[in-house]
Amino acid sequence: MRKTKIICTIGPASESEEMLRQLIDAGMNVARFNFSHGTHEEHKEKFKRLVRLRREMGVPVATLMDTKGPEIRLRDFEGGRVMLEKGSDFTLTTEEVMGTAERASISYKDLPKDVSEGGMILIDDGLIELRVNSVTETEIHCTVVNGGPVSNHKGVNVPDTDLSMPFISEQDRADIEFGCKLGYEYIAASFTTTADDILQIREILKAHNSRMKIIAKIESTQGVNNIGEILDVADGVMVARGDLGVEVPLEEVPVYQKHIIHLAEVRGKIVVTATQMLDSMMHNPRPTRAEATDVANAIYDGTTAIMLSGETASGAYPLEAVKTMSRIAEAAEHDINYRSRFKNRPSEFGADSTTAISHSTCMVAQDINAKAIVTVTMSGFTARRISKYKPTCPIVACSVSEPVACQMNLLFGVIPMTIPQEDNEEMLFEAAVMAAKQAGIAVKGDKVVLTAGVPLGETGNTNMIRVFEVF
């Protein structure tokens, strides 16, 4: 039973009802909606289709909206495409002009104020490199260091530069408000660089009474440098290796990945490893050996989830990609000694009672060789706390709330279930244990460890452990 969660990006290759159904059957835990593309109406249609399917199939697939984020893009070129020659002069301007091989417009009008002579500007994920020679109020005069073809609306990156553009654009604000109304479980905040970025999003969520959890996407040196303060306020982080690999030296990406995963794991926060994990499966039915190793290594490092982007959004083999990723994850998990990792985890002196009870729950489950840890939770808080310790046995997290159950599907080792509301706590506890039995996780005579907060409904009040024998 796989513990690591799989996120699939929904796009032309995967948005049909038939393919969504197959992806859910294959093990998709979270469906990602990329707001860099598509209209609100298109996203709404796909979202409602997925929600209908997850209810019909009884699988609590979570939904994640991924913001466009603060970005800089080139405007249009004559003929749609030009060739930049190495060593040639090239000017970026804030004026609205049709682009040529000598001059092109940029979307961010304050870029000349932010860059300086000698700096580097990258275009199209770093394929084109420019060196800044001089700057005026409206123009940035550059030399082409690495040339190549450039076409309409390609992205622009400025490594090691603090940009003064606002974190939340008008488009992002409209998208977030739309996401609040529709009811996504998660939001991935693109290009997060500080804790304040996350707090700005929290204010919007609060104003719309949204319980969306926030995943901070780390895509720059600033984001890496501020990872501690970001983890303090975010619900999780994503190692977004695509833009991160453009903003920082390529050889540093694996180092940062391991560093971020470790910090998130210690704090009990969700951590997603993303970008090009099975990239060759965009066109091939099997991944490279290096890609298989990359996926496995992220799991050995302690990632909560692994993400497919183009592989499921527009690739030729979306279903095969999910099945392959699931097999790789299961093989890696089978090799990991989670019992030993739990035993060697540093003690948390001065922990709050919920943390202490969650830790003790995992200890009891390990000592009695329990088939499962079962928790009844109204908010998902208890499940998140237990998931932090990555116990050997599965965590069956039951809630009367469908959104909470779906939200818990991004937690490591958690099997979320929706149970009916009962008249009292004892009946809820029995319903949770029976849910584990009906799912085939535990059978008659097996021991399970039950934990919850009594009375139910008070977030952060986990205070009870009980051993149940399944009857």
Predicted regions and their residues:
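Non-catalytic helical/linker scaffolds that mediate oligomerization, partner binding
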Residues: 1-471
